[in-house]
């Protein structure tokens, strides 16, 4: 399939585009920053009755994931090209996501770039509003310092309770990045959090 055909299967969201319509009575998961989509595809294959949103800002990555889905006959993934802050802040309906995976985002290790890190108190407030009651936030990173800081920020938010058992079903599913990292003998650190406090009514 050519690029035009692939692009017709990708939903592009900007501040000029309508909000996402998430179906009711469906278990909905989101892979935020899905990359080439190895994790996303495996998750969708494991749970064919769930709706899986694959989100990335890079069109080339989404095209590769689209090809992968066509090759394996995966039909329960929706591809979204969107910036994470806009998606979590505006486009997603409140109380619509059962589980969100944020796996190995850019750790921005240089001091002058750390303000670009996605995990922050404001991001967590927005995420809390988009998760369903008792919804799950799954985070991972290869950067030990970022991991420790992220855990601290999430704990201090008071919005989530840690429960790593909520990702026991996906411990053997890896992103393309984690697979390469593990092959070098290096670890990726995971944690899972349940929404324990509702900031807004939905």
Segments the model singles out, each with a brief description of its role:
Residues 58:
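Conserved SAM/SAH-binding beta-strand->alpha-helix loop
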Residues 33-35:
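Class I SAM-dependent methyltransferase "Motif I" SAM/SAH-binding loop
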Residues 152, 157-202:
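Class I S-adenosyl-L-methionine
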Residues 1-28, 38-45, 69-94:
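S-adenosyl-L-methionine
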Residues 119-133:
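A short glycine-rich, Lys/Arg-flanked "PGG" loop and its adjoining helix->strand segment in the class I
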Residues 134-141:
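Conserved beta-strand signature within the Rossmann-like core of class I S-adenosyl-L-methionine
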Residues 65:
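Conserved SAM-binding loop
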């Amino acid at each position: 399939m050519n690029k035009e055909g692939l692009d017709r299967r990708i939903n592009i969201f900007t501040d000029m585009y309508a909000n996402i319509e998430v179906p009711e009575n469906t278990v909905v998961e989101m892979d935020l920053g899905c990359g080439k989509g190895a994790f996303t595809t495996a998750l969708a294959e494991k749970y064919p009755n769930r709706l899986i949103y694959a989100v990335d800002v890079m069109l080339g990555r989404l095209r590769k994931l689209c090809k992968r889905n066509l090759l394996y006959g995966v039909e329960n993934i929706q591809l979204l090209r969107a910036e994470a802050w806009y998606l979590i802040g505006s486009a997603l309906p409140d109380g619509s996501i059962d589980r969100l995976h944020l796996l190995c985002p850019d750790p921005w290790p240089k001091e002058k770039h750390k303000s670009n890190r996605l995990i922050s108190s404001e991001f967590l407030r927005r995420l809390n509003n988009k998760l369903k009651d008792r919804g799950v936030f799954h985070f991972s990173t290869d950067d030990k310092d970022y991991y420790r800081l992220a855990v601290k920020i999430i704990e201090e938010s008071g919005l989530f309770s840690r429960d790593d058992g909520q990702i026991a079903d996906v411990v053997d599913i890896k992103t393309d990045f984690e697979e390469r990292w593990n092959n070098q003998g290096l670890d990726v650190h995971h944690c899972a959090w349940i929404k324990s406090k509702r900031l807004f009514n939905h």
